[in-house]
C-alpha cells in the first residue's frame, strides 16, 4: 500500500507540474503534497527493508551521524547549506567530530554545515523509492517558482537586485545580538534567480561557482541503486538562494540554494514577516542596515506553507490546514505504469542498467508498495484531522531516539546559548523548541502587503527623525546642564583650596620669619657680647703686661749706665720675656702659652688669609712670642730715650695700633684650629710670611696637607705645605748668641793669619760639623760661631749656581738671621772673612808629619781671617784643639732630630741610628793609618761623612790648585800606585764645576719625594762603606740630576745593619764617568764595569721563575751583558751609546779663569774680599797661579795621546765583553794598574791623583779629590757588600708576574690564600694581584734601563703611558712610585676614595703589609692601563733594604705604542668591563 501511495503522489506531482500556471490554490496543494511526502518519506525510512547493501546504505539516513552527509555530497542541488552563528563555536569546541572518507569539495568550508536531504537526488527523473518522491516534489515547486518569476515585471527584478545589494555579512557582531527569533539561526529570506538574470546582472552570476553545480560527477557511488536516471543541471536553470546574515569572513557568496522540503526554512521566513508589530511588511533583520519590503507576488513565489503557521491566500496567518486533496486514482495492476516524465526544464539521460534492474524489482513488488501507500495516506489523514481538532503542534515522535548518533548524546540544550538544529529531522533534537503557532497567537491581524503604500514610508521616516531629534536634543541639553554644574562645583572647590593654601603658606612664612629674626638677634647679641668681653679682657691684659715694662727699663738703665749697649739689649730681652710669660699664664688657654715648636708643622702663606683686605701687621704677631718682640722694641726705644713718660706713651700707642690686629689674629687662629681640629693641632703661630700649625706626628701633618690643601676658610683658599723655615729656632739661636757675646770676654787683637794652629782647628771643626758641604739653612742647626756663620752665608749669597748660571736667592729666614748677626758683629766691630780655599785645603788634618801640605797651602793661599784690628770671636780664645777633636758631636734635641721618613719603615731608621756606634768602633780601627795619610783623605770624620758630604751643598774647589797640590805631593813622597780599581772621569769645559749635590731640608719625607712624577733617582742603597762602593759616586750624580728641579733630599747616610761583620766576596770594578754637555745642560753618563765574582747561578735561579731564570742565565752567559747589567747610567745620558762616547774622546781645554767657570771664589777682578787682602798676599796668590798653570801644561802635553788611546781600549774591552771574569786576581790587578797609570799620565782634563794607604795597600785617586769620586776601600771586611736575591715571603715576593703562565698565577693565588688578608673589593684586589717578582738586578741596572716615555690620551681608558723610543724586550721601562703605607691605612684610604668619587685605584701591593699608593703622589707609572695581552710585566725587586716595583718590557715596544700590563684582578660576581680591545681580551678585568 505504501508503494502505491508513493506512485500516486508522484503522478499527482507530475500533473501539478504540468499545470504550473494555474491559480494559487494549485500552488498550495503542491506545497501540501510536498510536506506530506516529506513526512511520509521521513517516517518510512525507518521501516523500509533493505534489499541489498547499497539500498541500506542510502535509505538508512537517520541512523547516520549528522556529519556523515559528507559521504553523500552530489552537488549544489542536493544539499542543504545551513549557516548559523553557532557553527564556528561548535567547530572550535571540544566536541569530537567523526572523520569521513569523502573529502570536501574545493568551494566548501568547514564552517558551513551541509545537510543532505533524505532524498536520493533532486535531479532524478523517476524513482519508486521514498527518496525519489521527495526530490521530485521539491523540484516541482522549484520549477513552479522559477516559472512564476519569469512573468514578473522588470521592477520586481530590480527590486530583487536591491534586496541582494542590501545584504551584509555581520561577522563583526561577535556579541549576541538582540534577535527576535527563538533559535539562534540566521535570518533568511528567499529570492529566486531567473535564468535571464545571469545575463542581465553580473553580480548575481558570480555568487555561485559552476564547480558547485558540477560536483556530482565524483559522487555516483552514493546514488541510489534503483532504476532511475540522473541528469545534471546547469547552474543557470535551477539555482535558488537563501540569504543568511551570519556568514564567515572567508565566504565569497552571501546566498546559497534552499530546498523547500525543509520545513525549517519556511518557518524562519514566516517569523521574519511576523516579528515586526508596527509594520508587518518590514524584515527585522539585525544584519541589514535598512529594512526590506517584500511584495505580495514575491511572497507568493516563496511558496510559504501554512502547515506550520504560514500565511493563507489573503496573507493572513492561519492555523487551519488546507482542504484535503482528492485521493489519487488506483494504480493499474497490469501492465505496470510507465515512469513519470521529467519537467521540461530538465534534460534527462537514458536509464542505466542499475535503474532497469531496480524497475523490474519494483514491478514485482508493485502490489506491496500500493498497499503501503494507502496505509500511509490513511495515517496522514487521521493525523491532519487530529491536528485540526486539537489546534496544537503535533507531538514529537520519540521513536528514533535510540538511533540517535553518539555525537549528539552530550548535545544538551542551553537556553543562554541555544544550539541550532543541524538537520531537518526534528526528532533528533528533543530539547529544541519549535513553538510555531504559540508564538503568534497574541499578534494582531496584519494587513496584506498589497495595501501598503510607498508614500507612507517618507512620512514615517520624518516622524521617526523628529522623534529622534527631540530625544537627542533633550539628552544634549541635560548633558550640558550637568557638565556646567560639575564644572562650577569643581571651580568653587579649587578656588577654596587655593585660598586656603595661600593663607597657610603666608602664615608659615611669617612664622618662620619671626623665628629666624629672633634667632639671628640672639646670635648677634651673644657674638657682640663675647667680642666686647674679649676686647675688654685684652685691654686689661695689655695694661698688666706693659705697665711694669717702664720700671724694668729704668732700673736697667740706671744700674747699667757703665755697661755697653749689648748688655742693655740682653737685659731688656730677659725682662720682656719674663713679662710676656707672666701675662700669658693668666689666660690659661691651651694655645696661648708659648710652646716649644714641633718638628711636624705646616705652613700657610699669609697672603692667602687677609683681614679686611689687608695683611696683618707684622709687629702684632711673629710666631708665638710676638708680644715679646713688641715689648723688646718698646723697651729699646725707652732705653734710648731714658724717659719713663715717653715709654708709657709709646706703649699706649702701640697697644692702640695693635688692638684690632690682635683680635683679628685670634679669629684667624680660631678658624685655623677649627679647620684642622680633626688632626689634633698643637699650636698655631705666624711670622713675617707664614702661618704655622704644629702637629703631634708626621702622619697627622701629612694627612692634613693631603686633605686640606686647597680648601677654603670663608673666602680664603689655603695653600698648605710642609714647614720650610725655622724661624723659632733662629730666634732661640739669636738669644743664645747674645748671651754668649755678653758673657765672654773678647780679645782686642787676635789675627788668624798669625795663628795657623787655630785656623787648622777651626777647619777641622767645620769639617766635623759638615759646614763645608751644607747650606746656610743647615748651619743654623749646628750653630758654631757667629763670624764663621756670617762668612759662609755671605759666600753662599754670592755663589752662582753652576747649572742655572743664576745667583741663589736666600729666603727670608736667611736674611733675618744674617741681619741679626750683622747687628751683633757691628756691636763688637768684628768683620771676619774666611776664604773657602783655606777651608778646603785643610779640612781634617791632624798633627802628622804630612801636615806640611796644609801649611804650604795656607802660606800660598790667603786663607786667613781678617779682623781689621777690631777683635776676634769670643769663642776662639777657648778653643782647645784636642778637646774639640775628641769630644763627640752632641746629640740633637728631640725637636731638632729629623723625623722618621714616611717612605721607609721604622726598623730601617732605627737600625741606622743604633748602628752609629758600631760604625764608630769600626772606624777606630783605622785611626793609626789615618794619622799617616794626608789630611784630605785620611781623616776619620772624612771617612764617616764622605758620602753625606757629597750629597750636601757643592764643594767649590780649584781643580788647578788641587792638581798642583797632588802633583807636588806625588813628587815629594813617591808612593807606589797600587789599587784595586781605577776610575777615569772626562770632563768638558763646563763640567769642571762640581755638580750640585744638594738637599735643603733634612726633614724631607716621602711626600716631597713623590711630588716629582719621575723621581726614580730617589732609590738609594745602604750608604755604609761595605755597600756597593763602586756606585756611590754615580748614585750621587744620579740623585743630583734627578733632584735638580728643586726637590732636594738631605738625608744623612744610613748605616748598614750588618756593621761590616758579615764578610762578602771582594769585587773589583772599573768605573768610567763621562760628562757631556747637551742643550746647555750638563749630562753625565757613568759606565761601571764590574769585575767581581758573579753570584752562583743556581742560587739566583732557585728564587726565580722560568722566564726570569732564563733571562738571568742569558745575561750571565756573556761578559758584555754582565757589564751592561751592572753598569750605571744617568737617565738623561742613557740614549748615548758607547760608540758616541768613544767617537769624541778628546775634550776641549778647560778654562783656567775663575770668572769663566762661574766659581764664586776670590778673584782679582770681581771679588771684593780679594781686594781686601794685603798686597803681599795678592802677589803671592798670583805667583802660585802662574806656577800652577805651567806645571799643568807640561804634564798635559806629555800624556795627551796616551790617555785617549788607553781610554778607548778600556771602553771597547768593557762593552764587547772581552774581559774574562775568571782571570786571576793578579792579572786583574796588573791590568787595572796599567790602565790607571796610563790614564793618570795622559790626563787631558786636569785630573789629579792622590795615594791612600789602607792596611798596607796603596790606592791612587784619579780625580785628585776623594769627595768627588766616593771613598773606596780594599779592606776585606769593608770592601763590598754584594746584593743578593730577595727571600720569598708569605705572599710570594719572588713569584714573578712576568711569566703569565697558569702555574705562576695559581701559585700566587695559593700564597694569597695562606695570607688570609685578601681584599674584599675588586679595587683593592688590584694591588694584590698586579704581580710580584724578584730579581738580582741592582740599582745600576735599573738606571741603565730607564726609557723615555710620555702620557697622553689613551684609547683604552682616559690617560695612558706611551713610549717615545723603541724599547727592547726585558728592558726596564719605569718604576711604580707612590706613598708607602700599611694595609690598615690602605683600607681606610680606599673607603675615603670611594666617598670622594675617585673611580680609579692606584694601590699596588709590595708585600704583606706594604702598599704603594700613587693616588695623589706618584709618577707616570700610575697612568699605565690594563690589557689582557700586555706588552709589559710588573716585578718587585729588593734593592738594599727596600722593595721597588719595576715595570719591564715583555716584548719589543715600538715608538708611540701604549705601555700596558695585566692588573690580574681576582674573579668576582660583579664584573668590571675591559676596554683593551685586544684580540685576546677577556671582556672583564675580574
Swiss-Prot record:
GO terms for cellular component: chromosome; nucleus; Set1C/COMPASS complex. Residues 1470-1486 form the Post-SET domain. Residues 320-343 have a biased composition (Pro residues). One of its GO terms (biological process) is methylation. Residues 1347-1464 form the SET domain. Disruption phenotype: Cells display unusually rapid development, characterized by precocious aggregation into multicellular aggregates, and completely lack mono-, di- and trimethylation of H3K4 ('Lys-5' of histone 3). Cells also induce premature differentiation. Keywords: Activator, Chromatin regulator, Chromosome, Coiled coil, Methyltransferase, Nucleus, S-adenosyl-L-methionine, Transferase. Residues 359-400, 717-744, 1177-1255 form a coiled coil. Signal peptide: none annotated. Residues 906-931, 997-1006, 1022-1043 have a biased composition (Acidic residues). It catalyses: L-lysyl(4)-[histone H3] + 3 S-adenosyl-L-methionine = N(6),N(6),N(6)-trimethyl-L-lysyl(4)-[histone H3] + 3 S-adenosyl-L-homocysteine + 3 H(+); N(6)-methyl-L-lysyl(4)-[histone H3] + S-adenosyl-L-methionine = N(6),N(6)-dimethyl-L-lysyl(4)-[histone H3] + S-adenosyl-L-homocysteine + H(+); N(6),N(6)-dimethyl-L-lysyl(4)-[histone H3] + S-adenosyl-L-methionine = N(6),N(6),N(6)-trimethyl-L-lysyl(4)-[histone H3] + S-adenosyl-L-homocysteine + H(+). Changing residue 1474 to A: Loss of catalytic activity. The keyword Transferase applies. Residues 53-64, 532-542, 1179-1199, 1224-1240 have a biased composition (Basic and acidic residues). SMART domains: PostSET (SM00508), SET (SM00317). It is found in: Nucleus; Chromosome. Residues 945-954, 965-979, 1048-1064 have a biased composition (Basic residues). GO terms for molecular function: histone H3K4 methyltransferase activity; histone H3K4 trimethyltransferase activity; RNA binding. Residues 1-64, 83-148, 201-231, 309-360, 409-429, 532-665, 812-1103, 1130-1255, 1278-1327 are annotated as: Disordered. Residues 201-210, 347-359, 1139-1148 have a biased composition (Polar residues). Component of the Set1C/COMPASS complex. This is Histone-lysine N-methyltransferase set1. The lineage of its organism: Eukaryota, Amoebozoa, Evosea, Eumycetozoa, Dictyostelia. The gene is set1.
Amino acid at each position: 500500500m505504501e508503494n502505491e501511495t508513493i506512485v500516486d503522489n508522484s503522478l499527482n506531482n507530475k500533473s501539478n507540474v504540468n499545470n504550473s500556471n494555474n491559480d494559487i490554490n494549485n500552488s498550495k496543494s503542491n506545497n501540501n503534497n510536498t510536506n506530506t511526502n516529506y513526512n511520509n518519506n521521513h517516517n518510512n525510512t525507518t521501516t523500509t527493508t533493505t534489499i541489498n547493501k547499497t539500498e541500506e546504505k542510502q535509505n538508512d539516513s537517520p541512523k547516520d551521524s549528522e556529519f556523515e552527509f559528507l559521504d553523500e555530497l552530489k552537488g549544489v542541488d542536493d544539499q542543504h547549506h545551513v549557516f548559523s552563528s553557532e557553527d564556528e563555536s561548535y567547530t572550535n569546541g571540544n566536541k569530537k567530530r567523526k572523520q569521513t572518507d569523502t573529502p570536501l569539495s574545493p568551494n566548501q568550508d568547514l564552517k558551513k554545515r551541509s545537510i543532505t536531504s533524505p532524498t536520493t537526488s533532486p535531479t532524478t527523473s523517476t524513482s519508486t523509492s521514498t527518496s525519489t518522491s521527495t526530490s521530485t516534489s521539491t523540484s516541482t515547486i522549484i520549477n513552479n517558482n522559477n516559472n512564476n518569476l519569469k512573468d514578473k515585471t522588470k521592477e520586481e527584478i530590480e527590486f530583487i537586485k536591491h534586496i541582494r545589494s542590501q545584504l551584509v555579512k555581520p561577522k563583526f557582531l561577535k556579541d549576541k545580538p538582540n534577535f527576535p527569533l527563538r533559535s539562534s539561526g540566521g535570518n533568511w529570506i528567499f529570492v529566486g534567480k531567473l535564468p535571464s538574470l545571469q545575463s542581465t546582472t553580473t553580480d548575481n552570476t558570480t555568487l555561485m561557482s559552476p564547480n558547485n553545480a558540477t560536483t556530482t560527477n565524483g559522487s555516483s557511488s552514493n546514488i541510489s541503486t534503483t532504476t532511475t536516471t540522473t541528469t545534471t543541471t546547469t547552474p543557470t536553470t535551477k539555482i535558488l538562494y537563501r540569504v543568511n546574515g551570519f556568514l564567515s569572513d572567508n565566504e565569497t557568496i552571501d546566498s546559497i540554494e534552499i530546498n523547500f522540503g525543509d520545513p525549517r526554512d519556511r518557518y524562519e521566513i514566516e517569523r521574519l514577516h511576523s516579528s515586526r508589530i508596527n509594520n508587518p511588511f518590514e524584515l527585522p533583520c539585525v544584519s541589514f542596515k535598512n529594512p526590506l519590503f517584500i511584495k505580495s507576488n514575491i511572497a507568493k513565489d516563496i511558496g510559504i506553507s501554512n502547515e506550520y503557521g504560514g500565511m493563507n491566500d489573503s496573507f493572513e496567518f492561519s492555523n487551519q490546514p488546507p482542504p484535503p486533496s482528492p485521493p489519487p486514482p488506483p494504480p493499474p495492476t497490469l501492465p505496470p505504469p510507465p515512469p513519470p516524465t521529467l519537467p521540461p526544464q530538465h534534460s534527462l539521460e537514458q536509464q542505466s542498467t542499475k535503474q532497469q534492474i531496480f524497475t523490474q524489482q519494483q514491478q514485482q513488488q508493485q502490489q506491496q508498495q500500493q498497499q503501503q501507500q494507502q496505509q500511509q495516506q490513511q495515517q496522514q489523514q487521521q493525523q491532519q484531522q487530529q491536528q485540526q481538532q486539537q489546534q496544537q503542534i503535533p507531538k514529537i515522535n520519540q521513536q528514533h531516539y535510540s538511533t540517535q548518533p553518539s555525537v549528539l548524546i552530550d548535545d544538551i540544550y542551553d537556553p543562554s546559548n541555544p544550539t541550532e538544529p543541524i538537520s531537518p529531522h526534528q526528532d533528533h533534537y528533543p530539547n529544541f523548541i519549535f513553538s510555531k503557532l504559540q508564538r503568534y497567537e497574541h499578534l494582531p491581524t496584519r494587513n496584506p502587503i498589497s495595501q501598503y503604500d510607498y508614500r507612507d514610508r517618507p512620512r514615517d521616516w520624518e516622524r521617526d527623525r523628529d522623534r529622534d531629534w527631540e530625544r537627542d536634543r533633550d539628552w544634549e541639553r541635560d548633558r550640558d546642564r550637568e557638565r556646567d554644574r560639575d564644572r562650577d562645583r569643581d571651580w568653587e572647590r579649587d578656588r577654596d583650596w587655593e585660598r586656603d593654601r595661600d593663607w597657610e603658606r603666608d602664615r608659615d612664612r611669617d612664622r618662620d620669619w619671626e623665628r629666624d629674626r629672633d634667632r639671628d638677634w640672639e646670635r648677634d647679641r651673644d657674638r657682640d657680647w663675647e667680642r666686647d668681653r674679649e676686647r675688654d679682657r685684652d685691654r686689661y691684659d695689655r695694661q698688666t703686661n706693659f705697665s711694669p715694662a717702664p720700671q724694668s727699663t729704668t732700673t736697667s738703665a740706671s744700674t747699667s749706665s757703665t755697661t755697653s749697649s749689648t748688655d742693655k739689649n740682653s737685659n731688656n730681652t730677659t725682662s720682656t720675656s719674663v713679662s710676656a710669660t707672666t701675662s700669658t699664664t693668666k689666660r690659661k688657654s691651651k694655645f696661648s702659652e708659648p710652646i716649644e715648636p714641633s718638628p711636624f708643622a705646616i705652613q700657610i702663606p699669609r697672603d692667602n688669609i687677609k683681614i679686611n683686605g689687608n695683611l696683618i701687621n707684622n709687629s702684632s704677631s711673629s710666631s708665638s712670642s710676638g708680644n715679646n718682640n713688641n715689648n723688646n722694641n718698646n723697651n729699646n726705644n725707652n732705653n734710648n730715650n731714658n724717659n719713663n713718660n715717653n715709654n708709657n706713651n709709646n706703649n699706649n700707642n702701640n697697644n692702640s695700633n695693635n688692638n684690632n690686629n690682635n683680635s683679628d689674629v685670634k679669629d684667624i687662629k680660631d678658624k685655623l684650629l677649627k679647620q684642622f681640629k680633626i688632626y689634633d693641632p698643637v699650636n698655631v703661630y705666624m711670622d713675617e710670611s707664614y702661618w704655622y700649625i704644629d702637629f703631634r706626628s708626621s702622619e697627622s701633618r701629612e694627612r692634613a696637607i693631603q686633605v686640606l690643601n686647597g680648601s677654603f676658610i670663608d673666602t680664603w683658599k689655603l695653600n698648605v705645605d710642609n714647614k720650610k723655615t725655622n724661624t723659632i729656632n733662629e730666634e732661640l739661636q739669636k738669644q743664645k748668641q747674645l748671651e754668649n757675646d755678653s758673657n765672654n770676654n773678647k780679645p782686642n787683637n787676635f789675627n788668624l793669619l798669625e795663628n795657623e794652629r787655630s785656623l787648622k782647628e777651626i777647619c777641622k771643626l767645620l769639617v766635623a760639623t759638615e759646614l763645608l758641604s751644607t747650606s746656610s739653612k743647615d748651619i743654623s742647626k749646628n750653630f758654631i760661631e757667629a763670624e764663621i756663620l756670617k762668612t759662609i752665608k755671605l759666600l753662599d749669597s754670592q755663589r752662582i749656581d753652576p747649572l742655572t748660571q743664576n745667583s741663589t736667592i736666600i729666603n727670608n729666614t736667611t736674611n733675618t738671621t744674617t741681619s741679626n748677626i750683622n747687628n751683633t758683629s757691628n756691636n763688637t766691630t768684628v768683620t771676619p772673612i774666611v776664604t773657602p780655599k783655606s777651608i778646603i785645603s785643610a779640612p781634617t788634618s791632624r798633627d802628622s808629619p804630612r801636615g806640611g801640605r796644609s801649611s804650604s797651602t795656607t802660606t800660598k793661599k790667603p786663607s786667613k781671617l781678617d779682623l781689621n784690628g777690631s777683635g776676634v770671636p769670643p769663642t776662639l780664645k777657648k778653643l782647645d784643639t784636642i778637646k774639640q777633636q775628641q769630644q763627640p758631636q752632641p746629640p740633637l734635641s728631640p725637636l731638632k732630630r729629623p723625623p722618621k721618613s714616611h717612605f721607609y719603615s721604622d726598623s730601617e731608621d732605627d737600625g741606622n741610628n743604633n748602628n752609629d756606634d758600631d760604625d764608630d768602633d769600626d772606624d777606630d780601627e783605622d785611626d793609626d793609618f789615618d794619622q799617616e795619610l794626608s789630611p784630605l783623605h785620611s781623616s776619620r770624620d772624612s771617612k764617616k761623612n764622605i758620602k753625606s758630604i757629597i750629597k750636601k751643598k757643592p764643594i767649590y774647589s780649584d781643580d788647578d790648585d788641587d792638581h798642583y797640590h797632588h802633583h807636588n805631593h806625588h813628587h815629594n813622597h813617591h808612593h807606589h800606585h797600587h789599587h784595586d780599581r781605577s776610575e777615569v772621569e772626562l770632563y768638558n769645559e763646563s763640567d769642571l764645576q762640581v755638580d750640585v749635590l744638594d738637599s735643603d731640608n733634612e726633614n724631607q719625607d716621602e711626600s716631597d719625594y713623590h711630588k716629582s712624577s719621575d723621581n726614580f733617582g730617589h732609590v738609594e742603597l745602604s750608604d755604609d762603606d761595605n755597600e756597593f762602593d763602586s756606585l756611590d759616586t754615580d748614585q750621587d750624580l744620579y740623585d743630583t740630576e734627578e733632584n735638580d728641579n728643586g726637590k732636594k733630599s738631605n738625608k744623612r747616610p744610613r748605616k748598614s745593619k750588618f756593621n761590616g761583620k758579615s764578610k762578602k766576596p771582594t769585587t773589583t770594578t772599573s768605573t768610567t764617568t763621562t760628562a757631556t754637555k747637551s742643550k746647555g745642560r750638563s749630562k753625565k753618563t757613568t759606565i761601571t764595569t764590574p769585575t767581581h765574582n758573579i753570584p752562583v747561578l743556581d742560587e739566583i735561579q732557585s728564587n726565580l721563575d722560568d722566564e726570569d731564570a732564563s733571562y738571568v742565565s742569558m745575561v750571565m752567559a756573556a761578559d758584555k751583558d754582565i757589564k751592561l747589567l751592572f753598569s750605571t747610567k744617568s737617565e738623561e745620558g742613557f740614549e748615548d751609546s758607547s760608540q758616541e762616547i768613544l767617537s769624541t774622546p778628546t775634550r776641549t781645554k778647560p778654562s783656567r779663569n775663575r770668572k769663566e767657570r762661574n766659581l764664586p771664589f776670590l778673584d782679582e777682578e770681581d771679588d771684593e774680599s780679594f781686594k781686601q787682602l794685603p798686597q803681599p798676599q795678592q802677589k803671592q796668590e798670583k805667583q802660585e797661579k802662574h806656577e800652577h798653570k805651567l806645571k799643568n801644561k807640561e804634564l798635559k802635553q806629555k800624556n795627551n795621546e796616551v790617555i785617549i788611546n788607553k781610554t778607548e781600549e778600556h771602553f771597547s774591552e768593557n762593552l764587547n765583553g772581552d774581559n774574562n771574569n775568571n782571570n786571576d786576581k793578579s792579572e786583574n790587578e796588573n791590568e787595572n794598574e796599567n790602565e790607571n797609570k796610563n790614564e793618570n799620565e795622559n790626563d787631558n782634563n786636569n785630573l789629579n791623583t792622590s795615594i791612600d794607604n789602607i792596611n798596607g795597600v796603596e790606592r791612587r785617586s784619579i780625580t785628585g779629590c776623594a769627595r768627588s769620586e766616593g771613598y773606596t776601600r780594599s779592606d776585606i771586611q769593608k770592601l763590598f757588600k754584594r746584593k743578593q736575591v730577595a727571600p720569598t715571603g708569605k705572599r710570594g715576593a719572588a713569584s714573578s708576574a712576568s711569566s703569565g703562565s697558569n702555574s705562576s698565577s695559581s701559585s700566587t693565588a695559593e700564597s694569597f690564600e695562606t695570607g688570609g688578608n685578601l681584599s674584599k673589593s675588586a679595587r683593592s684586589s688590584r694591588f694584590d694581584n698586579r704581580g710580584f717578582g724578584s730579581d738580582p738586578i741592582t740599582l745600576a741596572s735599573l738606571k741603565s734601563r730607564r726609557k723615555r716615555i710620555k702620557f697622553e690620551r689613551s684609547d683604552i681608558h682616559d690617560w695612558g703611558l706611551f713610549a717615545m723610543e723603541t724599547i727592547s724586550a726585558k728592558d726596564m721601562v719605569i718604576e711604580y712610585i707612590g706613598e708607602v703605607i700599611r694595609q690598615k691605612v690602605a683600607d681606610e684610604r680606599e673607603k675615603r676614595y670611594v666617598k670622594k668619587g675617585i673611580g680609579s685605584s692606584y694601590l699596588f701591593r709590595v708585600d704583606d703589609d706594604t702598599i704603594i699608593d700613587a693616588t695623589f703622589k706618584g709618577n707616570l707609572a700610575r697612568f699605565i692601563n690594563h690589557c689582557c695581552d700586555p706588552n709589559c710585566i710588573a716585578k718587585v725587586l729588593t734593592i738594599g733594604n727596600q722593595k721597588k716595583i719595576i715595570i719591564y718590557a715583555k716584548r719589543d715596544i715600538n715608538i708611540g705604542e701604549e705601555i700596558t700590563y695585566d692588573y690580574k684582578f681576582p674573579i668576582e660576581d660583579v664584573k668590571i668591563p675591559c676596554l683593551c680591545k685586544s684580540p685576546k681580551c677577556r671582556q672583564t678585568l675580574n
